[in-house]
Structures are given as C-alpha cells and as structure tokens.
Regions:
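Phenylalanine-focused residue identity feature
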Residues: 12, 30, 49, 77, ...
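Non-catalytic ligand/cofactor/substrate-binding and regulatory segments of enzyme domains
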Residues: 1-29, 161-166, 189-252, 256-284
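Hydrophobic alpha-helical transmembrane segments
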Residues: 88-94, 147-152, 177-180, 201-213
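Alpha-helix initiation/capping motif
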Residues: 35, 100, 143, 209-210, ...
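Soluble extramembrane regions of membrane proteins in the secretory/endomembrane system
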Residues: 1-135
C-alpha cells in the first residue's frame, strides 16, 4: 500500500482491534460482507481511495460466478439451482469488489491522496506471497446439458412408445420424481432456513421442493391398486409450466439443462393426461419397464 507511516500504524491498530474476541466473528455474506469487503473497508478507513471511471460492460453476480466455474459445469449447474434472482441484478464497481480477483484488479487502478493532497496510486507494488499453480480443468462429456438432452430424448421415446402401445413406464416417472424431490429438498432447506443471500429468492422453489418425495409413496400405492395418480397430470405439469414462464419472463436466469428437465416433466404430465382421458382408446397398460 502506498500510504504514510501514520496511516500504516492506524491500519495496524484497526486490525488489532478487529482481531479482539468480541470483534473477530461476524455473519458472513459471500456477496456483500465477506473477507474481501472487510479488507477493502479497512484500507478505505485510513486511505480513502477513488476508482477510475467504470468502463466495464454491465454484469451480474451470476455472470461473475460463471466466469469462475466455466471449467466445472456440474458445480456451475448446482449453484444455478440454489441461487435465486438476487444474483441476476446488475452490479456497480463497489459491488464487484466483493470478488477477490476483481478487487485486486480494481485496486491496482485506484488512487488516493498524499499529505499534500496530490493524487497517487493506492498500491506501490505487488508481491505474490504463495504461488499456487492453477489446476488443469477436468473435461467430461457428461455435462448437465448433455445429461438433460439424453433424458429429454429418452422421455420423448418412452412417451411415444406409451402412445403407440399403451404400455406405462411407471419406473421412469418414479425415478424422475425421486431426482426432482432430492434436488428439491436441498433447495427447500436453503430457501427457508439459510441466512445466506440469494438462496431465499429462488423461483425454482416452485418446481424443486420435497413434494415429489412426499407424494411418491402415495403414487406407488395408488398405482398398485389400479387407481389413477394425479401428481404428474396436475402438479408435474403446472410446475414445469411455472419454470418455463419464469424463464420466459426473465424473472430469474434458469440454466438450459433445467429447462430441458422441465420439458421432461411437462411431457410426462401431458402423456399422463392423455392416458387418463383416453384410456379406453389405448391398447392397454402394463407394468414397469
């Protein structure tokens, strides 16, 4: 830091005070109050600084997070499932400084004032304390998008077979509900019980919640008794339409793989409605395949 000895001493005292037991813990907020923002606030107290005019294109928290996860598609997909619409808001310079690497880039261009009021660079030099080699990304063809495409193709094939032959692939529907419910359990817990930001504004709670897990045993028992189940015709269809509407209205950025999964739900729901309403016209039904 390009600061005077008096400013350095003041910064040191502030750090000592911050390290006291009554001050050393705080509610961590990875978007707005994290280790980077705390360090920047400490610097700003002793050496107020200015940033150059913002010439960066408009970006969001989600865009920045994606820039760090582009080599890990499953990690990116998982984060997109739990982070809500709060991360889709446009950011100013100060908000972007919550990210360590972006903060480093901006601080190299920041200026402060010396004792005479002259504008000087905030940073005098840079030193790499620990040089950690970057790990090579592990490429895999089984990305969330590829898996979702394969699942959609399987859904189309099985649905067409049902319409042509009257056979019912209940095991496929039950597996789809199980996966939906397990993912929904994570989203549900974060949505209602987590104090972290963004997870409580997740529109995907409409399709990813524990309801499929709760209803799955009921569905199995009804089908064993030869009764029509209403999960896929009603909730499955509505949840899929809800997800597509959220994406269409741009209320939240929904990953493409999730949209394809919603199409699978929608297709199975519509097939269930057709099978339910047109059952006498079909060739008949059979057990799981």
């Amino acid at each position: 830091l390009n600061i005077s000895s008096q400013q350095a001493a003041e910064l040191f005292q502030n750090l000592v005070l911050n390290a006291q037991p009554e001050n050393r813990s705080y509610r961590y907020n990875f978007l707005r109050d994290n280790c980077t923002s705390r360090a920047i606030d400490m610097i700003g107290k002793v050496a107020p600084f200015a940033l150059p005019a913002d010439k960066q294109p408009s970006t969001t928290y989600r865009d920045i997070i994606h820039s760090y996860t582009q080599d890990s598609p499953w990690l990116e997909f998982g984060q997109d499932l739990i982070l809500g619409c709060d991360v889709d808001t446009l950011l100013n310079q100060h908000a972007r400084m919550m990210f360590p690497l972006l903060a480093e880039q901006m601080l190299t261009q920041a200026t402060t004032k010396d004792s005479l009021g002259n504008s000087i660079p905030l940073l005098k030099d840079e030193t790499i304390v620990v040089n950690v080699p970057q790990a090579a990304p592990s490429a895999t063809p089984f990305t969330p998008l590829m898996v979702a495409i394969l699942l959609l193709c399987s859904t189309v094939a099985l649905s067409w077979t049902e319409l042509r032959t009257g056979r019912v692939f209940r095991l496929f529907d039950n597996t789809l509900m199980l996966v939906q419910g397990l993912a929904g359990l994570v989203v549900f817990v974060l949505f209602f019980f987590s104090a972290q930001p963004a997870v409580g504004s997740n529109w995907l709670i409409g399709v990813l919640n524990p309801l499929p897990l709760v209803w799955l045993p009921i569905k199995i028992m009804r089908e064993r008794r030869g009764l029509q189940d209403y999960y896929l015709p009603l909730y499955g269809t509505l949840a899929a339409v809800f997800t597509l509407v959220v994406a269409g209205l741009q209320l939240q950025i929904i990953p493409t793989a999730m949209l394809l999964l919603a199409l699978c739900l929608l297709m199975r729901g519509l097939i269930s409605i057709i099978r339910w309403r047109c059952r006498p016209l079909l060739a008949g039904t059979s057990s799981d395949k």
